[in-house]
Swiss-Prot record:
Organismal lineage: Bacteria, Pseudomonadati, Pseudomonadota, Alphaproteobacteria, Hyphomicrobiales
Record-given protein name: Holliday junction branch migration complex subunit RuvB
InterPro entries in UniProt: AAA+_ATPase, AAA_lid_4, DNA_helicase_Holl-junc_RuvB, P-loop_NTPase, RuvB-like_N, RuvB_C, WH-like_DNA-bd_sf, WH_DNA-bd_sf
CC terms in the record's Gene Ontology section: cytoplasm; Holliday junction resolvase complex
GO biological process: DNA recombination; DNA repair
Role of this protein: The RuvA-RuvB-RuvC complex processes Holliday junction (HJ) DNA during genetic recombination and DNA repair, while the RuvA-RuvB complex plays an important role in the rescue of blocked DNA replication forks via replication fork reversal (RFR). RuvA specifically binds to HJ cruciform DNA, conferring on it an open structure. The RuvB hexamer acts as an ATP-dependent pump, pulling dsDNA into and through the RuvAB complex. RuvB forms 2 homohexamers on either side of HJ DNA bound by 1 or 2 RuvA tetramers; 4 subunits per hexamer contact DNA at a time.
Family, similarity comment: Belongs to the RuvB family.
Gene3D superfamilies assigned: 1.10.8.60, P-loop containing nucleotide triphosphate hydrolases, Winged helix-like DNA-binding domain superfamily/Winged helix DNA-binding domain
EC numbers: 3.6.4.-
Length: 349
């Protein structure tokens, strides 16, 4: 199974609880996602001026890019209450009803992993989002009756890493869909520099750059790497985190110059050496690495594709020449027909 303790996993880990102090508190402090942030500011200002609930918001993007942080900022900027839960936690319609009936006017309800809601819960959510009403069935059999409960006008903020798993009726009820993208190195430098300041740790510009370059475009990983590099700097009695300290620390932690760790290199090396660089189907890779398909598609591959090391083609996964150069291997000569014209068309074996 994918090791949840991977330093560069974008998924939330137990030690990320310390990130709360590093999180921006409002949109002006939030770095990156410029267009999404600007649009969100307009929608928030308009709702606040009209004294109305903000339209329902859907954040889509890989883990660790700030979906939860933005949801909290939305509530803070609106000056309303904030309740948070996740799709798997809402097991039955009654759980959702309890959450919704306790919301005050214009409050924000945040549902992480909203694509994992059960169909029965989704059915209850539709009228709640559209008409601010709950349609519940009370009792069973011939004695069962339908009850309508009026709700306060609230804002649902959903977050998902798998937009394709959302049902169309649910997706269509979000008036403000926002896609979050990986961050640039410059944006991550700003995040690392701010984080070091919050932690009271001096850092040089080249030290922040070294951490940012290896943070895989993800603020959550940048904060995690910063905390670990800070440990190395403290142990060495360094006055500040500079490039040399950061390079030594991240090398010791097996995070290479491109932000790849042992799992990433194992994935790339398996395709390169065992399958001639590909194409190879994702199910074959799942068996070869003893990893579930979801972990490969959601955790391992996105950053490798973003970096240009991997292509999803109609015939399967294919390493690029860039990947071979990074591994220090000679790229094989390949028929151009192996490359798909339009990327991924699903799993191919």
């Amino acid at each position: 199974m994918t090791d949840p303790s991977r330093l560069v996993t974008p998924e939330r880990r137990g030690d990320d609880l310390g990130d709360a102090a590093l999180r921006p508190q409002n949109l002006s402090e939030f770095v990156g996602q410029q267009q999404a942030r600007a649009n969100l500011q307009v929608f928030i200002d308009a709702a606040r001026k009209r004294k109305e609930a903000l339209d329902h918001v859907l954040f889509v993007g890989p883990p660790g890019l700030g979906k939860t942080t933005l949801a909290q900022i939305v509530a803070r900027e609106l000056g309303v209450g904030f309740r948070a839960t996740s799709g798997p936690v809402i097991a039955k319609a009654g759980d959702l009803a309890a959450l919704l009936t306790n919301l005050e006017e214009r409050d924000v309800l945040f549902i992480d992993e909203i694509h994992r809601l059960s169909p029965s819960v989704e059915e209850v959510l539709y009228p709640a989002m559209e008409d601010f009403q709950l349609d519940l069935i009370i009792g069973e059999g011939p004695a069962a009756r339908s009850v309508k409960i009026d709700l306060s006008k609230f804002t649902l903020v959903g977050a998902t890493t798998r937009a394709g798993l959302l049902t169309n009726p649910l997706r269509d009820r979000f008036g403000i869909p926002i896609r979050l993208n990986f961050y640039t190195i410059e944006e991550l430098e700003s995040i690392v520099t701010r984080g070091a300041r919050v932690l009271g740790t001096p850092i040089t510009a080249d030290g922040a750059n070294e951490i940012a370059r290896r943070a895989r475009g993800t603020p959550r990983i940048a904060g995690r790497l910063l905390r670990r590099v800070r440990d190395f700097a403290s142990a060495a009695d360094a006055e500040a985190i500079d490039r040399a300290i950061a390079d030594h620390a991240l090398g010791a932690l097996e995070v290479d110059s491109a932000g790849l760790d042992a799992m990433d290199r194992r994935y790339l090396t398996t395709i390169a050496l065992n399958y001639g660089g590909g194409p190879v189907g994702v199910e074959t890779m799942a068996a070869a690495l003893s990893e579930p398909r979801d972990a490969i598609e959601d955790i391992i591959e996105p950053y490798l594709i973003q970096c240009g090391y991997l292509q999803r083609t109609p015939r399967g996964r294919l390493l690029t020449d860039h990947a071979f150069r990074h591994l220090g291997l000679a790229a094989p000569s390949r028929d151009p027909a192996q490359f798909g014209l339009f990327g991924d068309t699903g799993d191919q074996e």
